[in-house]
Regions:
Chain A
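Long, histidine/aromatic-enriched segments associated with O2/redox biology
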Residues: 12-31, 39-425
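N-terminal secretory signal peptides
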Residues: 1-8
C-alpha cells in the first residue's frame, strides 16, 4: 500500500515538476531526489511554485525561501475523528494555497455574498512566491503530560520523537515552547506566508488553537548549492556547511526517515527541532572584530575558516596558530558544531533571522529562529547542542528562549492527507 | 553620536610600535589594493614577502597582507636594527587577508613574513619611511605607564580576592550556624568583591561555574554548587514546594564554596595580566551588567542585582582609571567621554542606594531589583549602553 502510494506520488510529483520547469522553476525538489534547476531564473519570481503532494513534504529540501511564518498549535479536547478531519482540511487548503489558489473553495471575492469570504484575501495578486507549507506532530499529540493517550496513537509515537533534554543555559519560556502541531510556512513574500498561517488557523478554530507563532526574515541557511550563503544577525555567514539538496545520498542518510527506522508511518518524513535563540545584540556589537572571528572561527567578510582558504574550504582544526594554540579556537562555534567534532552528525538547517521589535529596556528583541531537520535528533541535534551549550564562545551572546520538536511525516499523495499513515491500521 | 566618539586613526595607531600588535587589524576583510596614500599590499608565500612599495611617507600606513602560501603566516615591521618588532600581525590563515595599521615615524625599517610561524622569516626587505612633514606623536615613556597599570591592577585583584575569601568564610559560617539574617546581609556585600574582578575569576574556567552558576546555567543532571545555590535556600521561593536544604546539605555546600574560593585565591597569586586583558576586562564587566544584572536575572531569589551591578561598574572604573594616563595621550576625547558616562551611570545607580555614601563595605545596601519601576530599569540600561559603547573602544585606542 505504502509503496504504491509513493510510486503514484512520485509520478505525480514528476508531472508537476514538468509543468513548473516550463515556467522556469527549479523542480524535482518535492521528490527530494534530484537537484533543483536553480540556473533557470523564473520569468516571474511571483509565479514560483513547488508541488505540494509528493514522497516528502515540501519546505525541507526546497531551496530556502526568504520569509517564514512558523506556527504552533494546541489541539482541543476533541475526538480522534475530528483531529483527522482537521488534517484533511488543512491538507486541502495548504495544497491550494501552495499553487497560488485560495484557502477555500471560493476566491476571496466570490462565494455567497452574505457570507464572510472563505479566504481572507491579502494574498490576492501576489502569486504563490514559492510557498511551502510543512506540517509536524509534537510529542504531546501522542501522549499528554499526564500520560493520557489522547488520540489512540500513543503506541505510534516514534522513538526518535524524544522530549528534548535540558541544555546548559536554557532559559526557555514555556509559552513559546512545545506544542501539539506545527506548521512551517515559507515563501519569498512575507504576506503570502502570513496569509497561509492566518487561513489555516481560521480553519482550525474549535479543533486547535494557536499556541505561539514566529515571523522570520532573511533565511540563515542555504539548502541548495545554487544559493548564496546568507548572514545571520551577528553579520556572519551562516549555514556554509549545511546539507544541500544536491547531495541526495547525504540527505537520505541524515534527513529522511527510512522504511526500516522504528515507526513505518514516518518513512519519508523527518524530525524538526526549533529553537528560538535570542541574540544579545548590543554586547555583540561592542565586541572587537578579532574576538567576533575567534568566537565564530570564520572570517567575517568571506566566511573562510580561520585555517584559511575560501568559504567552502574545509576547516583544519589541527592547524596550529601563534602560541601553539590551534588557529581555530577550541571553543569556536565552527569547531563545536562541525560534523568532524560530532561523530559525523549532520542536519539540514533552515533557520531565519527574527526581530520582534524591542524589549522594555530598549534593546532589540532579535536573534535566530533556528530550524533543523534530521532523521534522528538523538544522533544530530541533541549531541551537537549538548556540546555547544557546554562551551561555545557564542554562548556569551545568545540565550535559548524557545524550544520544540516535531515529527514531520512524509508527504501526502493527492487525494490523501498529511499524516494519513499515522491513523491507518 | 557614535562616530563622534571614534578615535582618530592617526592617534589609534600610535601604540602599534610598542604593544601587542595582533590587534592592529581593524579590517580583516579589506581588499583594497595598494595605491592610495599610505596603503600597501603584501603577498606572503612560502619563499617570499613582497611589498607593493619599498618606501612610504610617515603617518598612518595600512599594510594589507594576503597569505598566498599554504601555511599560517605572520608579518612583521622591524626597526632599523632588524630585531625590534615595531608592529606585527599573526595568525593569517592560507588564502586570508588581514590589515595592519601602523603610525610610522620617519626612518629605516625592515619588512618580513614568517610562513609556518617559525624561523627568521622570508623575504626580508628594507623599508624606508620618509618625512611627510606631519608630526607623528612620539610614544614617550609608555612602557613605564603600562607596567604601572598592570602592577596596580594586579594589586587590586589580590586585595579584592583577599576580602572575598574573608567575607566568604564569614558568610559560610553564618549560614551553617543558621544565622540566616547575617548570611543574607553578607551575601550581596561579599559578592561585590567577586563582581569587581569577575573577568579575572572567570578566566579560571572550572572555578567560575562552581562558584557562580545560576540554576538556569545547569545542564540536565548537573550538580548545583556555589553562591546561587545558597541564595535560593536563603530566599526560598514563596509559592512552589521548595524543600530547604538539610543541615548536612548546608554544611556541604558551604564547605564547597569556601574550598573553591580558597582555590581561586591561591590561583590568582601568580597571575600574569596583559594590557590587552585590562582593556577588554572593562567592557567584559559592562557586558556582565547588560546580560544579567540590569535584567534582574543574576539574583532571581535575593533580588540583590544592584549590589552586583555596582561591583561590576566599580571594577570597570578601576580598569579604565588605571589606563587613563595612557588613554589621555592617545585619545583625550575618549577619556573625557568615559569620565562623563561613568559619572552619569553611577548617579543613576546612586538613586537606588539606601545606605549612606560612606557606609562600610558590609553595610552597603540598595533597593531590591523587584522594587525598581520599569522606567528605572530602562534608565539604568540606557546608561549602561551609553557607557559601554565608548568603553568598547579602549582596546583599539590603546592597542591599535
Amino acid at each position: 500500500m505504502a509503496a504504491d502510494t509513493f510510486r503514484i506520488s512520485r509520478r505525480r510529483a514528476l508531472s508537476l515538476a514538468g509543468v513548473s520547469a516550463a515556467a522556469g522553476v527549479g523542480a524535482g525538489v518535492a521528490a527530494g531526489r534530484s537537484a533543483p534547476d536553480a540556473s533557470a531564473v523564473p520569468a516571474d519570481p511571483a509565479a514560483l511554485k513547488y508541488p505540494f503532494y509528493g514522497e516528502h513534504q515540501a519546505g525541507i529540501t526546497t531551496p530556502a525561501q526568504d520569509r517564514l511564518h512558523f506556527a504552533v498549535f494546541d489541539v482541543d479536547d476533541i475526538p480522534r475523528e475530528e483531529l483527522i478531519s482537521l488534517l484533511q482540511d488543512w491538507t486541502i487548503a495548504a495544497a491550494r494555497m501552495s499553487q497560488g489558489g485560495s484557502a477555500g473553495e471560493f476566491a476571496p471575492d466570490a462565494g455567497p455574498y452574505e457570507a464572510p469570504p472563505e479566504d481572507t484575501g491579502e494574498a490576492m495578486d501576489l502569486g504563490p512566491t514559492g510557498l511551502t507549507i510543512t506540517f509536524g506532530f509534537g510529542p504531546t499529540l501522542f501522549t499528554a503530560a499526564d500520560g493520557t493517550d489522547r488520540f489512540g496513537i500513543a503506541d505510534r509515537r516514534p522513538r526518535a520523537l524524544v522530549d528534548l533534554p535540558r541544555f546548559s543555559g536554557d532559559m526557555l519560556d514555556e509559552r513559546i515552547s512545545g506544542g501539539d502541531l506545527c506548521i512551517q510556512a515559507c515563501a519569498d513574500d512575507p504576506q503570502v506566508a502570513v496569509h497561509a498561517i492566518r487561513n489555516l488557523s481560521r480553519i482550525a478554530f474549535g479543533r486547535a488553537s494557536l499556541r505561539y507563532s514566529q515571523l522570520g526574515f532573511g533565511r540563515t541557511s542555504s539548502t541548495s548549492t545554487a544559493q548564496v550563503t546568507p548572514r545571520n544577525l551577528f553579520g556572519f555567514k551562516d549555514g556554509t556547511a549545511n546539507l544541500k539538496a544536491e547531495d541526495p545520498a547525504a540527505v537520505d542518510e541524515h534527513v529522511w526517515v527510512a522504511d526500516s527506522d522504528d515507526q513505518a508511518w514516518m518513512a519519508g518524513g523527518s524530525y524538526l527541532v526549533s529553537r528560538k535563540i535570542r541574540m544579545n545584540i548590543e554586547p555583540w556589537d561592542r565586541t572587537r572584530l578579532s574576538e567576533q572571528e575567534r568566537a565564530i572561527g570564520r572570517t567575517k567578510g568571506h566566511g573562510a575558516p580561520l585555517s584559511g582558504g575560501d568559504e567552502f574550504t574545509a576547516p583544519d582544526f589541527s592547524m596550529p596558530g601563534s602560541g601553539g594554540k590551534p588557529i581555530i579556537a577550541e571553543q569556536a562555534h565552527v569547531r563545536l558544531a562541525h560534523p568532524d567534532t560530532n561523530g559525523g552528525a549532520r542536519m539540514l538547517r533552515r533557520g531565519y533571522n527574527f526581530v520582534d521589535g524591542n524589549d522594555d529596556l530598549g534593546r532589540l528583541n532579535a536573534g535566530l529562529f533556528f530550524l533543523c531537520f534530521q532523521r534522528d535528533p538523538e544522533r544530530s541535534f541533541i549531541p551537537v547542542q549538548t556540546r555547544l551549550a557546554g562551551s561555545d564562545l557564542l554562548n556569551e551572546y545568545t540565550r535559548h528562549v524557545g524550544s520544540a520538536i516535531f515529527a514531520v511525516p512524509g508527504g501526502a499523495a493527492e487525494g490523501s492527507y498529511v499524516g494519513a499513515r499515522l491513523f491507518e491500521s | 553620536m557614535i562616530t563622534a566618539r571614534l578615535p582618530k586613526p592617526a592617534v589609534v595607531a600610535a601604540a602599534c610600535g610598542i604593544l601587542f600588535v595582533t590587534a592592529c587589524t581593524p579590517n580583516a576583510s579589506a581588499e583594497t589594493a595598494a595605491g592610495g596614500t599610505g596603503e600597501l599590499s603584501v603577498t606572503s608565500t612560502a619563499e617570499d614577502c613582497s611589498v607593493s612599495a619599498a618606501t612610504a611617507e610617515s603617518g598612518p600606513l595600512t599594510f594589507t597582507i594576503r597569505n598566498a602560501g599554504d601555511q599560517v603566516t605572520e608579518f612583521y615591521l622591524l626597526a632599523e636594527d632588524g630585531l625590534r618588532i615595531v608592529s606585527e600581525v599573526e595568525n593569517i590563515g592560507p588564502g586570508i587577508s588581514r590589515n595592519l595599521v601602523v603610525n610610522a615615524t620617519p626612518g629605516s625599517y625592515y619588512t618580513v613574513c614568517k610562513p609556518g610561524m617559525v624561523g627568521d622569516g622570508v623575504g626580508r626587505a628594507a623599508f624606508t619611511v620618509t618625512d611627510s612633514g606631519t608630526a607623528v606623536e612620539p610614544a614617550g615613556d609608555e612602557q613605564a605607564q603600562i607596567d604601572a597599570a598592570l602592577t596596580n591592577y594586579k594589586a587590586y585583584v589580590k586585595d579584592q580576592v583577599d576580602q572575598l575569601l574573608t567575607g566568604t568564610e564569614d558568610f559560610a559560617a553564618a549560614y551553617v550556624a543558621g544565622n540566616d539574617d547575617e548570611a543574607r546581609r553578607l551575601y550581596p556585600t561579599t559578592r561585590m568583591h567577586f563582581e569587581r574582578v569577575e573577568p579575572v575569576a572567570e578566566s579560571f574556567g572550572d572555578l567560575d561555574p562552581k562558584l557562580d552558576n545560576r540554576e538556569a546555567d545547569l545542564a540536565e543532571g548537573e550538580e548545583w554548587t556555589g553562591w546561587h545555590r545558597i541564595e535560593k535556600d536563603l530566599w526560598p521561593p514563596a509559592d512552589a514546594g521548595y524543600v530547604p536544604l538539610t543541615q548536612a546539605e548546608r554544611e556541604a555546600v558551604a564547605a564547597q564554596l569556601v574550598e573553591d574560593t580558597t582555590t581561586l585565591h591561591s590561583s590568582i597569586q601568580g597571575i600574569e595580566l596583559s594590557l590587552d586583558q585590562l582593556a577588554n576586562g572593562a567592557i567584559g564587566l559592562m557586558d556582565e551588567v547588560a546580560n544579567g544584572k540590569v535584567t534582574g536575572e543574576e539574583e532571581i531569589w535575593s533580588g540583590t542585582d544592584l549590589w552586583d551591578f555596582q561591583g561590576n561598574v566599580e571594577g570597570a572604573r578601576v580598569l579604565a582609571d588605571g589606563l587613563r594616563n595612557l588613554l589621555e595621550s592617545r585619545d583625550p576625547e575618549l577619556a573625557a567621554t568615559l569620565d562623563a558616562d561613568f559619572t552619569s551611570l553611577s548617579a543613576e545607580l546612586d538613586k537606588h542606594r539606601t545606605s549612606a555614601p560612606d557606609a562600610a563595605q558590609r553595610d552597603i545596601a540598595y533597593v531590591s531589583y523587584g522594587d525598581l519601576a520599569s522606567e528605572d530599569v530602562k534608565a539604568l540600561s540606557d546608561r549602561v549602553n551609553a557607557l559601554s559603547e565608548p568603553l568598547s573602544r579602549i582596546t583599539a585606542a590603546l592597542l591599535g
